[in-house]
């Protein structure tokens, strides 16, 4: 199984560092970016299988555009105040899940599950 690359857009630097540490144990490489434009460029450049997107820096429309532009990438959204309505909207827009940014287990589990499903489908 080929390791997946992850692109991370997270506005809180402490949370970002925690996520980078957790993700680095499970993925080929983790690249942290500072903007949505940089996220798009990095997904293409690194052929990322996973994009983790802070919903405080992006809109549902952004999630929808990313999922159309990169249909094989697993998009995991994070938001500190996510509720059921936000989760439903994000999943309908193409995200795999919405997790609290502090729940690194949920984020890693979602990314691993969806990345392995994508790889199985491609095989």
Which residues does each PLM region occupy?
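Two-component/phosphorelay signaling modules centered on CheY-like receiver
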Residues: 12-34
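Acidic, metal-coordinating helix/loop segments flanking the phosphotransfer/catalytic sites
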Residues: 34-50, 58
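Negatively charged, flexible loop motifs adjacent to catalytic sites
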Residues: 38, 58-60, 81-85
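Two-component signal transduction core modules
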Residues: 51, 75, 98-99
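Short amphipathic alpha-helix used as the core "switch/output" element in two-component signaling
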Residues: 60-72
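Alpha4 helix (beta4-alpha4-beta5 surface) of REC/receiver domains from two-component response regulators
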Residues: 79-97
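Conserved phosphoryl-transfer motifs of two-component systems
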Residues: 96-99, 105
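Receiver (REC) domain switch/output surface
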Residues: 103, 107-122
């Amino acid at each position: 199984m080929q390791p997946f690359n992850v692109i991370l857009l997270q506005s809180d630097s402490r949370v970002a560092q925690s996520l980078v540490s957790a993700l680095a144990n499970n993925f080929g490489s983790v690249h942290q970016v500072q903007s949505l434009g940089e996220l798009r460029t990095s997904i293409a450049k690194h052929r990322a299988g996973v994009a983790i997107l802070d919903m405080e820096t992006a809109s549902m429309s952004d999630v929808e555009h990313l999922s159309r532009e990169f249909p094989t990438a697993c998009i995991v959204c994070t938001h500190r105040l996510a509720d059921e309505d936000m989760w439903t909207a994000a999943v309908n827009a193409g995200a795999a899940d919405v997790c609290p940014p502090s729940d690194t287990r949920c984020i890693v589990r979602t990314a691993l599950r969806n990345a392995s499903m994508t790889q199985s489908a491609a095989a």
